[in-house]
Structures are given as C-alpha cells and as structure tokens.
Amino acid sequence: MGKDTIADIITSIRNAQMAKKGTVRIASTNLTENVVKILLREGFIENVRKHRESNKDFLVLTLRHRRTRKGIYRTILKRISRPGLRIYSNYQGIPKILGGIGIVIVSTSRGIMTDREARLQGIGGEMLCYIC
C-alpha cells in the first residue's frame, strides 16, 4: 500500500481478478469509500462491508461473478490522473469510455462522481480513473 490510494484500489481489484479471488480487502479512507460507493452503485462490485482490525478500518469488496460461469466478471480499470501528472478537464472534455458504456470517476468541487453526473451538473475536475 503506497500513498496513491486510487492506484491501490485498482491494483488490488485487478490482482484479485487475475488470481480468481472473490473478495478484496483495501484500506478505508474517505476517498476510497467514495470511489467504492460509485463502483457499487454502477454494478462493478457486488457488495461492500467495513471491517475493523487492530484500530485500522478496512473495506472488504465482493467482486461481481458471471451468472453462467464460475469466474469473476472481468472489468478494465485504469488510472488516469496520478500524483506525478494530474489530469484536469472541464465537463465538455471528459471522455466517453466505450461510447458511454464505461465510466470515468471524476473528483469535483462537489465531491467524487461519475462522468455522467459531472456532465449533467456542468462541472469538471480531476479525472481519477476509468472503468469499463
């Protein structure tokens, strides 16, 4: 776990998918909780629960499974803005991922939201990551 909590979330989920694990445990911060709420609301993860262990809070994510096969549902997660190179955009410049099928998570002055919500409210911000 490094100082880039968004990259830690993405890496943990990606590693769990490749190892065919059903759950992921990540450190709980305000930023990670907001990003995980968006992932849960958009259907990219199945369940979230808070876990406290030795005075540290963790989030336990249950990854979404395919209905027909036993495998984990594969999602593509990529970090856009990073600590060394921040990427900002106004609401018109936020990209549409796969023609609107995927989502971009944007950190705005009104909180963390999806690209659709940012476009509807007419506000831009820092593009954190995209999921498709």
UniProtKB/Swiss-Prot annotation:
It is found in: Plastid, Chloroplast. GO terms for biological process: translation. Keywords: Chloroplast, Plastid, Ribonucleoprotein, Ribosomal protein, RNA-binding, rRNA-binding. One of its GO terms (cellular component) is ribosome. GO terms for molecular function: rRNA binding; structural constituent of ribosome. InterPro entries: Ribosomal_uS8, Ribosomal_uS8_CS, Ribosomal_uS8_sf. The keyword Chaperone does not apply. Gene3D superfamilies: 3.30.1370.30, 3.30.1490.10. It comes from the Eukaryota. Pfam families: Ribosomal_S8. Disulfide bonds: none annotated. SUPFAM superfamilies: Ribosomal protein S8. The keyword Plastid applies. HAMAP family: Ribosomal_uS8_B. NCBIfam families: PRK00136.1. Part of the 30S ribosomal subunit. PANTHER family: 40S RIBOSOMAL PROTEIN S15A. One of the primary rRNA binding proteins, it binds directly to 16S rRNA central domain where it helps coordinate assembly of the platform of the 30S subunit. Belongs to the universal ribosomal protein uS8 family. This is Small ribosomal subunit protein uS8c. The gene is rps8.
